[in-house]
Structure formats: structure tokens, C-alpha cells
Regions:
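Hydrophobic, small-residue-rich alpha-helical packing segments that form membrane-like cores
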Residues: 1-11, 19-34
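Glycine-rich tight-turn/loop motif centered on a GG-T
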Residues: 1-10, 38-57
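Generic structural signal for helix capping and beta-alpha/helix-loop junctions
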Residues: 21, 42, 111-112
């Protein structure tokens, strides 16, 4: 709270995964909130510390805190989903769970112009004593423009992220982010495998 009051710039805090912590940070005066502990491709926090909450649950709980805080104070604090986001579908699910925005690492690291040359280093906690990140090879799959805007060369949802969001929103009948945050969510693991026998056998699309 003292930090937020002492600085003339907006403070984005995180990362948190629970309703209680999210609400307290909002009451302390943060301008935005990062949500997610451990889901990142290069993050090892869950293994090193044994701490973490599934990302969909974390975003849902923290967005509930945002809505309650808004009703109480009139101040809207954006929720930023951070970690485990690889495909356009991942982004869409984060928004459906309540996120106002997302932060992505691996998709950007796969750009041919990324400085890692196909590697992604989890540096959220670069402690020399107890590091919680590792260096992983994600490969280089295309230009940053192709990854974000297409046209896609890959069929696994990692290219044309903007297009995925637009198409998902139109399919759901959502005109904006706020409407997409209110769509019905169904927990259905079978959606990833139902009817995908040939994709899985041939290592294509969702079968990779």
C-alpha cells in the first residue's frame, strides 16, 4: 500500500492465485494484477516449492475478487493471466475464465526474431540460491507477425493468435471481452480427444 501511494506510476502486482490475496492487493491500490503460479512452460515453482493452483481456477477466483472490489469501490482492476499460454485456445479460455488480458512467453520466444534463437528461459524468479525457472527449447516457427496475426503455417493453434480470439468470440456470440468473460464454461476433458483418432495417429493438429 505504501509503495502504491509513494509512486506516481501505476503498479501491476503479482503473481497471485487466490481470491483473498487478489482482494487485498486491490485494496492496497494496485492498478493491475498478474495471476498464475507455476503453469509457465519454463517455470519450476510447483515442483520446487510445491505451490500452485490450476490456472483456470486461479483466474476465476481472482476475477471474482475483481468484480466484488469493483462493486464495493467503483474501481476496476484488470486481471492478467500469466503462464501456460501456448495456443489461441489457451488465450480464449483465460478470457472466458475472467481475464482481461494475458501475458505470453513461449509463443513470442518461438518467433524467428526472438533473441533466444528458439529457446525460452523462465526468469520470473532468477534466484541463484533457489531458481524457479529453466531454459527450454521451444523452436522457431515463424515471424512474430505470423504468430500473432497469421496467416498460419501450423495447424496446432500456435499461429495467428489474434485470429483465434476473433473467431472464438464470433462463434460464442461475444462482441467484446466483457461478453466473452460471461460465456458458459464446461469442464470437459474429452473435448481434446473426442473424434480425434486420425489426428492422434498421424500426429497432426490436436494429436501432436
Amino acid at each position: 500500500e505504501d509503495l502504491c501511494k509513494s509512486l506516481d506510476i501505476p503498479i501491476i502486482a503479482g503473481n497471485c492465485v487466490t481470491y483473498e490475496v487478489a482482494k487485498r492487493l486491490m485494496e492496497a491500490g494496485v492498478a493491475g494484477l498478474m495471476v498464475g503460479i507455476g503453469p509457465g512452460a519454463a517455470c519450476t515453482s510447483r515442483g520446487v516449492l510445491g505451490i500452485g493452483v490450476p490456472q483456470a481456477t486461479a483466474i476465476s477466483d481472482c476475477s471474482s475478487a475483481r468484480d466484488d472490489y469493483f462493486n464495493e469501490s467503483g474501481k476496476y482492476i484488470p486481471i492478467i493471466g500469466d503462464g501456460g499460454i501456448v495456443t489461441g485456445g489457451d488465450i480464449c479460455k483465460c478470457i472466458a475464465c475472467g481475464a482481461d488480458a494475458v501475458m505470453i512467453g513461449s509463443p513470442i520466444a518461438r518467433a524467428t526474431t526472438a533473441p533466444g534463437n528458439g529457446f525460452h528461459w523462465g526468469m520470473a524468479t532468477p534466484s541463484q540460491i533457489l531458481p524457479r525457472g529453466t531454459r527450454i527449447e521451444v523452436g522457431s516457427t515463424g515471424s512474430l507477425e505470423r504468430i500473432l496475426k497469421g496467416p498460419a503455417l501450423l495447424d496446432d493453434g500456435t499461429h495467428n493468435l489474434y485470429g483465434a480470439i476473433r473467431t472464438s468470440m464470433s462463434t460464442l456470440g461475444a462482441k467484446n471481452i466483457k461478453e466473452m468473460q460471461n460465456v458458459e464454461i464446461v469442464i470437459a476433458p474429452a473435448l481434446l480427444t473426442e473424434g480425434k483418432v486420425y489426428q492422434k495417429a498421424q500426429q497432426l493438429g490436436m494429436g501432436k
